[in-house]
Every structure is written in C-alpha cells, then in structure tokens.
Amino acid sequence: MALLSHCTSADRRFEQFTSRVFREEMTASTLNMHYTIADPAAFGITDYEPVLPLYTSGQSDASGERCSALLRQLSCIAYDKLSPENAFTYTLLQRSLENDLALAQFPYYNEPLSPSSGMQSQLPILLAEYTFRSRRDVTDYLALLDQVDDYFASLLLYEQEKAAAGFLMPDVSLEKVQKQCDTIVPIQELAQGTHFLQTTFEDRLVELQAQGILSAEVVSSFLKENDRLLTTVVQPAYATLSEGLYS
C-alpha cells in the first residue's frame, strides 16, 4: 500500500507540474493556444490576456534560466515511481527542455522573418484561419491585431541584434522579405474592403450570427473595428518593418 501511495503521489506531482507548464506555454501566446486547444477552460485556463509573444533583449538568457529551473523541478519528481505513461512523458519533456537549454546558447540562429516561412507571411494566414467559436474568440482576435505593431517592432529588434552579432540575413533574402511586407497588406485593398483579412473576418462573423451568438449590431461594430485596426495598426506595422530592415 505504501508503494502504491508513493506512485500515486509521484504521478500527481508530475501531472500538476506538466499542467502548470502547459498553461504557462499556452497563455504566453494566444495564437499558439487557439491553434492547440478549442476550449481553454477545459485545461484550467480561464483568466488570460490575449497576447502575441514579444521578443526582448536578453530573452535567450531568460529562456535558458527558465529551462534550467524547470529541469531542476522535474528532477525532484521520482521517475521510477511514475506510471508508464507519465514516465514516457517525463522522458520527452526532459529531452525537450534539455534541447531548449542547449539552443539558448545560440540566440541568433533563428530566423523569424525567413523569406519562405517567416512571420511576415505566416501571421496573416494564421489570422485568416483563426477559428471563431465564441464572442471571446473575436475580441481576442481583435486584441491580437492591435498588437501587430509591437510584435513586428520586437522582431525588428531581434534582426538588428542579429546584424550587430554578424548574423544578418543575405541581401537577397532581405529584399524578398521587404517585398512581402510591401505587398501583403496593400492600402488600396483595405480601402476597397477586398483584402482577405477583411473578407475572411466577415465570413466568420456571419457564421456566428447565423448561430445566434452575435447580433447584427455587434457584427457591424466588429467589422468597423477590424477595418480600423487593419488600416491604422497592421498596415503601418508592415511599412515600418519594411523600412526598418534597411535602416
């Protein structure tokens, strides 16, 4: 009975630990959370702020320190007393944290603005495919739009630090990224209301209205706010990023 009690205790501690780590990871990026889980409340995530993850100077050091802290906490859990399923998860988590810790020593090897799959081109796609299941999803989405300028500014800071460290991307790649920034959110399409971030947004709102989740008045209000944010936040953010890459 004592052995069974110890096993249960170890499993409980491990599951509490992994649940906490999961919640921290999810609430650090609303985009990641939304594409990972449909119902955050089912995972104990009920009070969160919609955020895009911003890069800050020294972030790699902080990330390494967090990985080290999590590995220390993980090591305090008796691996040999875990269930087979939890033991397997333990091994995977430990390996992942160790890899992240090793990568933290190479802070400028990432390329978030890659010409082929950088966030300048991926973010609009993620936004266009952002599923609306509730009114909260819509308000989260609009809050994320309102942070695109800060998000791109943080990526530009990262690129500037990379350049100072001798890791600036080649000129041909910079030119491709700049061209993408100049063409992804054209002012003309926004003025005409034909940009895909306008049309897909309206389509999703119409579905919520058909389900009785949103009224016509609320839909109209959300459409106006989306247009405002695309025009005053998102489009200028792309222009600023394009200019900053060559400054």
Predicted regions span which residues?
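N-terminal maturation segment of proteins
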Residues: 4-247
